[in-house]
Amino acid sequence: MYGRRRIRIGYVIDTWTWVEYYAGRISAVQEYIENNKFDLFTSVLTLTEMINFLNQTESAHTSLRVVHEIGIRSLVVPVSRDIAVLAGGCKREGFRGGIADTIILATARIGNHTVVTGDLHFKGLPDVLFIEHP
């Protein structure tokens, strides 16, 4: 008898989502991060954005602790040559996000994953799970 193989869903968590998660503002964000049915990935650029964001209001120690926790909750994906090339293609196709957002999108696409975000730059893209918010 052949066993059934469970295919897990992979999500790339972007900076907006991590910020909302740690701020505790949007409960829908928690569903994706805390539900262990999903494989979570985070672009290494998201870590840079998180440190930059957190350093505005938090201590360096807190910023590093949060980045460490992100690394525990998700697989941190470095920017490979393939991701960089694909990101360039995303910009050519008209994606209006900045370079970091473009690399996050390419990270998801190269792994056949879905970006989880509420960032308006991503709204309407087919490989994005957009979280509506006020």
Question: At which residue positions do the language-model features occur?
Answer:
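Short, well-structured N-terminal submotif of metal-dependent ribonuclease cores
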Residues: 1-42, 53-68
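Acidic, PIN/NYN-like endoribonuclease modules and their adjacent C-terminal/linker elements
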Residues: 2-9, 105, 109-134
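Histidine- and aromatic-rich ligand-binding microenvironments
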Residues: 13-16, 42-44, 96-98, 119, ...
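Alpha-helix capping/helix-boundary segments
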Residues: 17-18, 46, 83, 103-104, ...
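Conserved beta-strand segments of alpha/beta enzyme cores
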Residues: 39, 75, 129-130
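Active-site neighborhoods of divalent-metal-dependent phosphate/nucleic-acid chemistry enzymes
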Residues: 76-118
